[in-house]
C-alpha cells in the first residue's frame, strides 16, 4: 500500500511512458464532465493527475468523491501534455499522470483557509490550525532551509573538532537577565528549578572539564515581553572554546557563516566581516545593531551649534546633551509639513521632545528654525552635512541616549519608506569594544551589559570600584542587516575577578556564594582561558528565508502573549496536581 516511486514535484519529462506511484494531498479538483483533474501535492511540489473513463472507469468513480486535502495513493502513467495545456509555472507543467488506480488514504473536512502561499487569513487562525498552515509550500521551504542551516553548522563544527554536548534543562534560578520560567519540585517542597535562559554556566564548566571545544543547538527559555523577533522559547547555536583569542573566535565564526550562506543561499560572502566599536555604532547609526545596507548616517553638530541663536540646540549642548542630524538626500520635495509632523510624532515614541527640520533650496536653508542661524552658521552646517539643493535636514536635540534612540529609529523608518534598502543584500558586521556595565538610573545600580561572566579588559579591572562605567568588555556581537544575530565574549576564568564582578553588580558575598558558589569553586581547579558565542538560530533562518516574523521559522510558536493557540497552553491544572507540588493558586485576574 505504501510503496512510492516518485515525489510529486520530481515527475519530469524523463519519466514519460513510465508507470509511477504517488502519494499526497489534493490541492485542487476540477470536474470537466467526463474528465476529472486533480493537482496532487506533497512536500516537493504539485503534479496534475487526470482521471479518464478511457484509462480507468473505477479510478474515475473514486475521483468523483474526492475533495480538497484528501490524502491519496495514485498509480498511473506519465504522459506528455497536449500542446496548449503546458503550465510554465510548474516544474511538472509539461507532463501529467493518467490515473489507473487511486486509493483514498484519508478524507478531510473543508479546511478553514486555502492551503496556498497566497492565502489571506489572520495569523491567529494560522496558528490555531498550524498543522494546516505548515502544509503551505512557503512554510515547508522555510523549515527545509532551517534544516540546511543547522546541518551546515553541525558539519562545520564537527570538522573543527567540536563536541556536541547536551546541558540540563532543569537548572538553578538566577536573578540576572530576564525572568526565569520556574518549575516546582515535587520531591523538594517549596523549591524550584528554572528552565535555562542559556547554557552559559554549564558550557564554562565544560571548559573547566577540559572538553576545549563544545557546541549545542540549545533550547532556551526567557519569560520576557515579546515582540516580532522574540519568543519565550527559542533555539540558539551555543559555542564555547578554550585557548582561543577573540580574533581566533571571530575568524572561526566568519568561516562558519560563510559555509551557512553557501549551503542555504548559494552565495559566497566576503570575509573577514567589518568591525565597528560600540561607540562608533552609536555615534554613526544611533544603534548597537546598525543596518549598514544604506546610508543616512547621524552627524554630530553639537560643537557647531553650542553658541547658536536657537536656544533649543544651544541649551541641549550646554546641559550635556547632543544635537545630531540626518541629511535625507533629495527628499525636500517628498515630505510635506504634514509628513514631517508625522515623523515628529514617530520620534516622540523614543523620547524626543521634537524634530527640527530644514530644507535646502537654491538660495539657502528654509524652514521654521532657519532664522536662528547666521549665514556663516548655515554654510558651515551645510558643509558638515554635505547638503545640496533638494535635501531635507532633520535634527534632534536632547540627552545623548535620546538622540541615539530617536534618530536611530528614524533612520530605519526613512530607509524603509524611501526604499533605500537592498533587500537582497546580506551585510554582516561585528560590534566590538562594549562597555562591561550599564547603569540603571531607576534602580540606582549597575547591570552587566552582556552577562556577569564577561571578561573585562585587564587594565580596566582596577576601575571596578572607582569608575565601573568606563570598564571595557572583551565582548562582541554579530549583526546582520540590522538584527543582532548573537553575542559572545571571552569569559572570566579567575575567581578573584569573578567575585569583583559580582560585587560591582550588587551581590553580597553570601548571595554570590549561594547562587554561583559551584562556579567559583570550579575556578580553583585549573581553568583554561576560554570564550564563545551564542547565535540565534530562529532569527538567522528568518533573515535568510526572507521572513518578517520569527514565528514563521518555529514549527509551533507562541503568540505575543506567550500562548499556544493550537494546544491552548498555558492552561489550568487540577487541584490534585497542585497538591502534589505543594502549591496553592491565589486569586488572579485572567489575562486576555
Swiss-Prot record:
Site (described: Important for tRNA non-discrimination): 84
Record's subcellular location: Cytoplasm
Gene Ontology MF terms in the entry: aspartate-tRNA ligase activity; aspartate-tRNA(Asn) ligase activity; ATP binding; catalytic activity, acting on a protein; nucleic acid binding; transferase activity
Enzyme Commission code(s) on record: 6.1.1.23
Pfam families: GAD, tRNA-synt_2, tRNA_anti-codon
HAMAP family listed in its UniProt record: Asp_tRNA_synth_type1
Listed name of the protein: Aspartate--tRNA(Asp/Asn) ligase
Organism annotation: Anoxybacillus flavithermus (strain DSM 21510 / WK1)
Primary gene name: aspS
